[in-house]
Amino acid sequence: MRCKVFVNGCFDLLHLGHIELLNKAKECGDYLIVGINSNSSIKNLKGPSRPIFNSQYRKKMLLALDPVDEVIIFSEANALNLIKKIKPDIYVKGSDYKNEKTPETDFLLKLKKKIIYVDFYKNYSSTNIIAKIIKKNDKA
């Protein structure tokens, strides 16, 4: 039986931090499922100017990456319902979530599922990249 690993996020403006997270997540099991927030979900989380890339574009980008086996788009604010549906063996999150209680981690801990927190590149963030681009354009 294969070991299903699940990771989720916006993955808007794919960057090195995302790649590192996905590579480390794939090392944890046999089959990596990536849940991505829908366009409307990102708008609610990040603001009206987001996402930069629509969900189908982001899905295709992620599927082109070697560690990714499957991508599922979800429209809720969190991935809890998707986790209940796919029943992963391992859930991987960035270490920035280590001290946060989330509906996903609460649910998985009750089921005694493994949660792995991965260190990430602190200087890589889609939001920070967008801010840098705006700042550079303002100076031009």
What is the role of each PLM region?
Residues M1-A140:
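Nucleotidyltransferase catalytic core that binds NTPs
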